[in-house]
Design a protein with these regions (language model features):
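A generic alpha-helix signature
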Residues: 131, 256-259
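Internal helical hairpin/lid segments
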Residues: 259-276
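Active-site microenvironments that recognize anionic phosphate/pyrophosphate groups
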Residues: 1-166, 172-244, 249-252, 265-266, ...
Length: 350
């Protein structure tokens, strides 16, 4: 037991994530250590607006032999290499509890954000981002009529395993609740039953009052580095009011969401003057049977970027993180400050 007074900026500590029920080890004293690890080459930042060899550009032929239309806004098509199958059969039950198998069904789609091969989300005009939001909502609602979970997400950049440079996202519809969603369903419901209020609605109010982890605030939206963030510059984007699914957003809230996404992703790119890689996606109330209470759910987006110190140095979740629990050096408050310190106007637009 130490006689020194605890200081979260200097002393190692753990932070609890009430959404997942897991802890994150924070080691702020390590942030000053010298770095001699991997230094990756940054991705090519200048791309043409059209690439005749790109499978996602308008009028080009894909691997399947299908030809893309001359689309002007977003374009959605069935993933040519889907991870799920609509007609997959049920798996036989096993009498051995150590070898369980569950048959699953679903489908995967690709969403091209725009016809421009060179423009990522932060580089698109707000009205184009608004079109992406509308497409997300349409796809989620359509597939939610048949599947209990619909995951909308984007992997941006080669670092995140993106195999096509043309800016795009994906939609995976599942006949089952994935692990992350099942954990959130359990913890959100438990909080709601114990406190009589929505965890993330309460969290927004707490973050607005604190202020130290806020990155972007608009009329209807708040982006923060979560108190329990595991990735260096991880953020969560939430509405300021109780919204269970994207379909419940008003036109004003959707317009404002486009502005919030533009500001947040521009700050990411501006941090290291590069096309900032990340995995992002939306969480919202699953599509349970009609009549099921979903008031404990709150719409939110999660951004998980791997960059740590520069455009070429990234965080690796290895060793202790894989075998024990997530660990970070930079505190959430320090990360938020660094993101606040850069402009929300994209460096290419200045």
């Amino acid at each position: 037991m130490s006689n020194v007074e605890f200081n979260p900026v200097d002393h190692p500590h753990r932070r609890f994530n009430p959404l997942t029920g897991q802890w994150v080890l924070v080691s702020p004293h390590r942030a000053k250590r010298p770095w001699s690890g991997a230094d990756e080459k940054p991705a090519i930042d200048e791309l043409p607006s059209y690439d005749e060899k790109c499978f996602l550009c308008p009028t080009n032929e894909r691997v399947s032999g299908d030809v893309n239309p001359d689309y002007q806004g977003t374009y959605v098509f069935k993933n040519d290499f889907a991870a799920l199958m609509v007609d997959s059969p049920d798996a036989p039950e096993s009498d051995n509890p150590l070898f369980k198998t569950q048959g699953v069904r679903g489908l995967s789609r690709v969403i091209c954000f725009s016809p421009d091969h060179s423009k990522t989300l932060p580089e698109l005009p707000v009205e184009k981002i608004r079109g992406v939001i509308e497409t997300w909502n349409e796809q989620i609602e359509e597939l939610g009529k048949e599947y209990v979970w619909v995951q909308a997400f984007e992997n941006k950049g080669e670092t995140m395993g993106c195999s096509q440079p043309h800016p795009h996202g994906q939609i995976w519809a599942n006949s089952f609740l994935p692990n992350e969603i099942e954990r959130k369903e359990h913890n959100l419901k438990a909080y709601y039953q114990e406190h009589g209020s929505n965890l993330l609605v309460d969290y927004v109010q707490a973050e607005l009052k604190d202020g130290s982890r806020i990155v972007v605030e608009t009329e209807h939206w708040l982006a923060v580095v979560p108190y329990w963030a595991a990735w260096p510059f991880e953020t969560m984007l939430l509405p300021k009011t109780h919204i269970r699914r994207m379909s419940e957003l008003s036109d004003e809230q959707r317009d404002d969401l486009a502005r919030a996404i533009k500001k947040l992703t521009s700050r990411y790119d501006n941090l290291f003057q590069c096309s900032f890689p990340y995995s992002m996606g939306w969480h919202y109330a699953p599509f349970f049977e009609q009549g099921t209470d979903i008031d404990h759910w709150q719409l939110h987006a999660l951004f998980y970027p791997p960059l740590l110190r520069s455009a070429t140095i990234r965080k690796f979740m290895v060793g202790y993180e894989m075998l024990a629990e997530s660990q970070r050096d930079l505190t959430a408050e320090q990360a938020a400050q660094r993101l606040r310190d850069v402009s929300d106007v994209h460096y290419k637009e200045c």
